[in-house]
């Protein structure tokens, strides 16, 4: 589609209008089976090999709730500081679309399992913003459509569609915020920070891997503008399936600029769904949103109510792990680093590898140095995530240990790491195979130092004359002679000793 | 309580993908009106202190453990499909159907 959309500059939009956002995030739970039947949820299976009469919506088939799905929903609710319903039901959300063979989605309507919570999120500059949570409810995912006959699998122009129902019925938790007000120009940043914090939280709870690129976590961005000084919300648009952190921020920003252009030229915003396009960062019109009552929600007659006992809820609460924001703040203090440093670590996905490396015996500074230095560089070059590199935290800890013991210097350690990444074996094996040991044999070092002094009489004289800085050239000569395997600090000591100068 | 209008029945029919003739709209509007009237009388009796019934059995928390059960084979799953292709259910074009 080549339709262009009028935009005003972001600054101009914010000068006239105040954005209000609502974020809906769907999280696919990592349960072994679907929400209402025992079909596997394993990824990558052949089409329609993980279906049964229940998830295909066959007449007479009866759903039964997955206990782990309910427990995960309660865990998420508690971690979001929500109240947990004492009694709640599922509801049928009726609609005709081939992605749901039942012609309804089993969801929750007016009785969500969790409600009235909040999540504190940290912005890049360390400021904390509290996002209020309206509800978290249980529902199920839809099947996957493959559109045939149009350009590159797009729905437009397709002659027909092919449905795989392996995904239909996989448990989803939908987490809905209350309207996010007061973020002003930082609204897109708040949206991104919220989704990131939520992702960290979901992972820490162990209920899902929440990999956005695999559709395990998907975000809808609702956005409206109101003129400054007014209370009443404007008409909102709902941008569906925004599937990366960067896209969440871009989608919010684009919609602010688009709405402002429409409103300031005297137009009105249509309440509709919009599609986000990764390539251009823009949104285009989808279908006009059906009113909620058009879904004709009613209580699901085939499922009995879920009434989590208070004992169960408290048991789940007491087993919650340390939550990500609390953990990050604790580690930041323990490591004595700034908020910016911590943010870089998070952005690089290095937090867990660093913690694992420290757990394996490394000191915090070395663990950070290797993961944020050599390894981050290597990951960048190969386009991989840090945890996908062919080196384990235990191996990084071993490299750090060899450096601490003086058996490797940083330069050699870097080579060891490259060797491990290249599949040459464990750090110790790489040290052996590549012959990477610091020359600590004083005899050999002394000989190399003598040779360097003899070969550079001019430099030696300068040093004798008090120009200690000139020693660098001799250190370099020794390092070259030992193929980088000497301890540079020790070499410098020896040179100064030989030439009868002290550092100062 | 005002009853259900003909327009509302037409709207519901559209949502349910039912094609109704004008005389059928009339007919169902009358019938649905009677049903809604009957339910409304129940609501008059049931006050806030009466919990809503969603199931005839007084059960809660019927759950199953998260254990994989055998699925249908794709052949079985697709056996009732009017059309199939690439081991998938084949359906007509989705957009532009209205």
Curated annotation (Swiss-Prot), chain B:
GO terms for biological process: glutaminyl-tRNAGln biosynthesis via transamidation; regulation of translational fidelity; translation. This is Glutamyl-tRNA(Gln) amidotransferase subunit C. NCBIfam families: gatC (TIGR00135). It comes from the Bacteria. It holds the Pfam family GatC. Allows the formation of correctly charged Asn-tRNA(Asn) or Gln-tRNA(Gln) through the transamidation of misacylated Asp-tRNA(Asn) or Glu-tRNA(Gln) in organisms which lack either or both of asparaginyl-tRNA or glutaminyl-tRNA synthetases. The reaction takes place in the presence of glutamine and ATP through an activated phospho-Asp-tRNA(Asn) or phospho-Glu-tRNA(Gln). GO terms for molecular function: asparaginyl-tRNA synthase (glutamine-hydrolyzing) activity; ATP binding; glutaminyl-tRNA synthase (glutamine-hydrolyzing) activity. Keywords: ATP-binding, Ligase, Nucleotide-binding, Protein biosynthesis. Belongs to the GatC family. Residues 47-98 are annotated as: Disordered. It catalyses: L-glutamyl-tRNA(Gln) + L-glutamine + ATP + H2O = L-glutaminyl-tRNA(Gln) + L-glutamate + ADP + phosphate + H(+); L-aspartyl-tRNA(Asn) + L-glutamine + ATP + H2O = L-asparaginyl-tRNA(Asn) + L-glutamate + ADP + phosphate + 2 H(+). Heterotrimer of A, B and C subunits. Its EC number is 6.3.5.-.
